[in-house]
């Protein structure tokens, strides 16, 4: 007989019981996201999902993303309830710009030591994002990995699949001289530029929880969840001839708008058509950030830009604003052989 202590997985830092407790905690909110096409429930080796029958030539569209270092700010401020919405938004907004309806979503949650309350708050936020975008949360991976993450740190990633009719894919090929650009207002910095945000907070010595901006803590502005545009944009696509949609994420105006422009076209943005939300003015002032850098790093109050024919503008604005969006005409498309694909004037 040996006197050696018998070791368990829990002794090594992996608590299977905590993982099971998390599954029990989130089952209810996950169930609310279920679409009729989804087969089976949580716990299978894989999730099954049929294609909606309304599509004649369905094309699957997929995307994966994270939330960048906004997660670091969320962890530092111990506010975990909306970061899951950000995660879903970053994925589904990328799908809908191609005309795709999100079908299902999977998440990856990794941590050194699983805190059931924190993980439950994050995944509840993911479920809320799925509800807002009409897609099902069909599964995920919760990885407890001792020694891989410091303290209570965690990381999240998301993966989404959507579907679009082949003949209705939006790829920017129809964009032409004279098209009008419509902006959809953002809820804040969304999930991009947060390494610069955190550097500005560090250099300025500002406490985002005690610094007020427009009558509420700066932290509320910085952690406002990314706006999910899916339902508004899908209705717009059904009723209006949309030529292109750009999701303003990393790279801001300069990098994202050209992704949907054909050769020999240029987007001309009218800077006087909107005022930056105060959080962007604060960031620019506190960090002494140049204007060009602001437009390269942040959305500056614009979450999406939609290109469509001029005769469709009034109808589009009415539809979008009726659905709760802050939408306005922000610019036009011009024929141009310039290497500068976007002009802000």
From Swiss-Prot:
Presence of keyword Ribonucleoprotein: no
GO biological process: 'de novo' IMP biosynthetic process; adenine biosynthetic process
Enzyme class, first EC level, given as a word: ligase
Principal location: cytoplasm
Metabolic or biological pathway, per its Swiss-Prot or TrEMBL entry: Purine metabolism; IMP biosynthesis via de novo pathway; 5-amino-1-(5-phospho-D-ribosyl)imidazole from N(2)-formyl-N(1)-(5-phospho-D-ribosyl)glycinamide: step 2/2
Gene Ontology CC terms, in alphabetical order: cytosol
Keywords, comma-separated and alphabetical: ATP-binding, Cytoplasm, Ligase, Nucleotide-binding, Purine biosynthesis
TM regions (residue ranges): none
Compartments where found: Cytoplasm
InterPro entries the record matches: PurM-like_C_dom, PurM-like_C_sf, PurM-like_N, PurM-like_N_sf, PurM_cligase
Regions annotated as coiled coil: none
Entries under SUPFAM superfamilies matching the protein: PurM C-terminal domain-like (SSF56042), PurM N-terminal domain-like (SSF55326)
A single MF term (Gene Ontology): ATP binding
Domain of life: Bacteria
Enzyme Commission number, as recorded: 6.3.3.1
Catalytic activity: 2-formamido-N(1)-(5-O-phospho-beta-D-ribosyl)acetamidine + ATP = 5-amino-1-(5-phospho-beta-D-ribosyl)imidazole + ADP + phosphate + H(+)
PANTHER family: TRIFUNCTIONAL PURINE BIOSYNTHETIC PROTEIN ADENOSINE-3 (PTHR10520:SF12), TRIFUNCTIONAL PURINE BIOSYNTHETIC PROTEIN ADENOSINE-3-RELATED (PTHR10520)
Family: Belongs to the AIR synthase family.
NCBIfam families documented for this protein: purM
Protein name: Phosphoribosylformylglycinamidine cyclo-ligase
Lineage: Bacteria, Pseudomonadati, Pseudomonadota, Gammaproteobacteria, Enterobacterales
Gene name as annotated: purM
